[in-house]
């Protein structure tokens, strides 16, 4: 999973590192910057592995679904007699004024496929509770740099797991 980590998102956004100014007055290029930060990533990965803090898990499912205006309706089963959930999505404010619900067969109306069942697939990922609990301990102990590194790694590893699974 670590091979899917977006280093730019981790190093710059989560960890807030920035390129440094070199002795000749120029800034590090992207590769120099990443080469400088990668040892921190390797250290964080090694310590989380040693402590058993990263426990990747995925749950997925396929659900009977229909679009209903700006809502995606999920059904308990293919009979479509009981709604499991209804999720509202924003509609674009400019042409073509699309909404995620538009990409599913409509519940009713004059459109092709109206009234027919459709399906939506979802997956949820986690790196487990242990990394979040450890990050909370670091934060409570005022170890903000350690917290930032661990929390950021947990976030980006979850993103990596989602990318891997997808």
Label each region the model flagged.
Residues 1-148, 152:
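Active-site loops and adjacent core secondary-structure elements that bind or stabilize anionic groups
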